[in-house]
């Protein structure tokens, strides 16, 4: 969207805060139904990020595929589970939670240090070459492919990681 600078910045900060709150809700809420709704909120915030980035097709695909299909499927599956164990045996902190928090914090700081140490000059140069190349492209699908592999690579990969973690969590819950 072509918004004035302060409004665009406010919306980015607001959506980022919404992503953080929704992500914490997915991880910290003891009821899996509320966690699934929080995941839906996170996915809607990501699609709004795409709208702010003028990538309306990817935002629509995000809403239709991830929010409309996958999140509804997760909620549908969670509703069929027996939730009596979640309401009675909830402990605030266990040893496994501490180990998981330590591993996740270590991964977060290593990713931040990797991002800060990366030379982004080559990435910007590749993006500029793709913008020159983009003028010669005819079809919209080629333009979407280039944008997904250059401009929106990080959000695209983050969504795939979120889905992988959700599938691993669903498998571990189903095995118990």
Swiss-Prot record:
InterPro entries xrefs: NAD(P)H-Q_Oxidoreduct_6, NADH_UbQ/plastoQ_OxRdtase_su6, Nuo/plastoQ_OxRdtase_6_NuoJ
Subunit structure: NDH is composed of at least 16 different subunits, 5 of which are encoded in the nucleus.
Chief place of localization: plastid
Bilayer topology annotation: Multi-pass membrane protein
Protein name: NAD(P)H-quinone oxidoreductase subunit 6, chloroplastic
Function: NDH shuttles electrons from NAD(P)H:plastoquinone, via FMN and iron-sulfur (Fe-S) centers, to quinones in the photosynthetic chain and possibly in a chloroplast respiratory chain. The immediate electron acceptor for the enzyme in this species is believed to be plastoquinone. Couples the redox reaction to proton translocation, and thus conserves the redox energy in a proton gradient.
Molecular function via GO: NADH dehydrogenase (ubiquinone) activity; quinone binding
Keyword line: Chloroplast, Membrane, NAD, NADP, Plastid, Plastoquinone, Quinone, Thylakoid, Translocase, Transmembrane, Transmembrane helix, Transport
Enzyme class: translocase
Localisation: Plastid, Chloroplast thylakoid membrane
Organism: Draba nemorosa
